[in-house]
Regions:
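Contiguous beta-strand/loop segments that form the cofactor/metal-binding neighborhood of enzyme cores
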Residues: 1-247
Length: 247
């Protein structure tokens, strides 16, 4: 994943509506390094790879396992790959989510294109008989083996990388979203709004655990952490006259 956030001086800009782009983020001089694409690496606007890619991966795991919120989260990482650049978010991070009956481990390393299981990104469901590796580009099954008469024999049949057939899933989702908006009918959505919201919330929890440096615990009845410092990071501080509407 690209990460070219070298130090860049502030400049004047006349092309963009910069104030509107900033929105509720703190007012500061325009700097091209904090604009598109690199805004992802600055806390004022985003949450680094934990949230940028977390919502594209975590939703698959949460949907498959039928869960929404973890019992606890802890994270460790830092700026290890690019310690001297201007970015603020961790380029390297491991986050452990504890759910009932299983843990989910998130791991990212900016600048390293090769990943586990021969893929650049994805979710691995690790079971007793095999590992299912899946992302938006397809899936594969890697079997565990067992000793049978001195030979290592696969417990289940291996499934090589298989791509989904038919039209692009991204195109189908985009069309479905637009049609649902035009009909003003969220029930038409193939991927419900809640699916996206819980993925975003879990991703933000990872960053909150990283910022506190603690293992934080979630109270599902109150929709709050049990830690005061963690709760202070749930809501952003709005600037420039922007306010979060109260519903």
């Amino acid at each position: 994943y690209p990460d070219d956030a070298s130090e860049t001086p502030d400049t004047l800009q006349t092309v963009y509506d910069y104030d509107m782009w900033l929105g509720p983020a703190p007012k500061r001089p325009f700097n091209p390094n904090r604009f598109h694409f690199n805004f992802r690496w600055f806390w004022d606007y985003a949450g680094g790879l934990m949230t940028d890619w977390g919502v594209h991966e975590i939703d698959i795991a949460l949907y498959a396992m039928g869960v929404s919120a973890p019992k606890s989260v802890m994270a460790s990482g830092g700026k290890f790959a690019y310690p001297d650049d201007a970015s603020e978010t961790p380029d390297t991070l491991q986050t452990v989510y504890e759910y009932d009956g299983f843990n989910m481990l998130w791991e990212h390393a900016t600048g390293i294109d090769g990943g586990n299981y021969g893929t650049t990104e994805g979710i691995a469901f690790i079971g007793n008989n095999a590992t299912l590796v899946v992302n938006r580009g397809g899936w594969k099954v890697i079997p565990e083996t067992e000793n049978v008469d001195g030979q290592r024999v696969p417990k289940v049949e291996e499934v090589p990388h298989t791509r989904p057939s038919g039209p692009s899933a991204l195109d189908l989702h985009a069309v479905n979203f637009v049609e649902s908006v035009m009909a003003n009918d969220p029930s038409q959505l193939k991927c419900a709004i809640q699916t996206g919201s819980v993925a975003a919330i879990n991703a933000q929890m990872g960053n909150i655990a990283y910022k506190t440096g603690k293992k934080v615990y979630w109270d599902a009845t109150k929709n709050l952490f049990t830690d005061i410092e963690a709760n202070q990071l749930i809501k952003a501080n709005y600037h420039n006259g922007w306010k979060l509407p109260v519903v």
